[in-house]
């Protein structure tokens, strides 16, 4: 209410009003312009993109689709199932853009000797991905893209890059590709992307040491995603890529607003 300058005596927008506002943003196709305008305002306040940038992606869950095997096969082929065509109301409730992916996580498994070992597990998740680039100095989101949950993270690096006063770029191993290295080199940027282990080979000692140092910096981006999911409760309950993009973009914008409020109090711009 304070953000909207509403008093206790004022009417608070209901859920339908907020939904319609978001829908108007989607149909007008201006959400990226809105995000860019606020980024320009931040720079005008002295919060320039500084010290390099960190790139990463996070899965944003969406309601699971209960589709038959035939419907799944049709969707994979890019077709609309015949049963959906005959039922427009059903078609309107089906998200044909969200996709399944596997989320990697760590778990502790009990061993025979009573100790616990860390094992890697894969958790199926249905939804979209929020790809972002933040600046290292202020941890503000400077660029973003939204894809289906199955999209390859590394392919989105060019889409989330922004102008920065420094040339360093940090990212995990998924972003270490020849195409990305060539892209960074062409723009005069310095790759701090984690080294990838070659098949059948282990990383060298210097590479392991470099990855540990890079992880300490790269981990800052995890705090952005954690804030969106814990403080905002970010999930996608809309249908389709266009609406999902608006929903996620607004979450990125809202994060920057809250981050600016914190920065203004604790780290005033010079």
Language-model segments: what does each one mean?
Residues 178, 182, 186-187, 207-270:
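Basic, amphipathic alpha-helical segments enriched in Lys/Arg and hydrophobic/aromatic residues
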Residues 58-59, 194, 200-201:
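Short secondary-structure capping/turn micro-motifs that flank functional sites
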Residues 155, 179, 200-207:
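Short, charged, surface-exposed secondary-structure boundary motifs
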Residues 131-133, 143-145, 170, 192, ...:
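Structured core elements
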């Amino acid at each position: 209410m304070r953000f909207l300058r509403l008093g206790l005596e004022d009417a608070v927008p209901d859920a339908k009003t907020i939904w319609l506002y978001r829908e108007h943003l989607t149909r007008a196709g201006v959400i990226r312009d809105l995000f860019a305008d606020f980024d320009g305002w931040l720079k005008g306040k002295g919060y320039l993109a500084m010290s390099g940038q960190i790139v990463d992606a996070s899965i944003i869950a969406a309601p699971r689709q209960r589709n038959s095997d035939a419907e799944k096969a049709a969707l994979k082929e890019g077709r609309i199932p015949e049963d959906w065509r005959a039922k427009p109301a059903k078609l309107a409730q089906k998200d044909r853009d969200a996709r399944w992916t596997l989320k990697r996580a760590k778990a502790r498994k009990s061993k025979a000797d009573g100790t616990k070992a860390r094992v890697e597990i894969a958790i199926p998740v249905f939804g979209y991905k929020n790809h972002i680039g933040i600046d290292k100095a202020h941890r503000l989101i400077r660029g973003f893209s939204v894809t289906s949950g199955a999209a390859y993270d590394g392919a989105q690096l060019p889409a989330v890059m922004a102008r920065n006063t420094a040339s360093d770029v940090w990212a995990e191993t998924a972003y270490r590709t020849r195409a990305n290295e060539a892209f960074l080199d062409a723009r005069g940027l310095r790759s701090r992307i984690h080294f990838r282990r070659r098949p059948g080979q282990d990383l060298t000692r210097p590479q392991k040491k470099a990855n540990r140092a890079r992880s300490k910096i790269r981990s800052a981006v995890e705090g952005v995603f954690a804030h969106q999911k814990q403080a905002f409760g970010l999930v996608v309950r809309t249908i389709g890529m266009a609406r999902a993009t608006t929903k996620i973009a607004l979450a990125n914008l809202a994060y920057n607003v809250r981050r600016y409020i914190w920065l203004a109090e604790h780290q005033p711009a010079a």
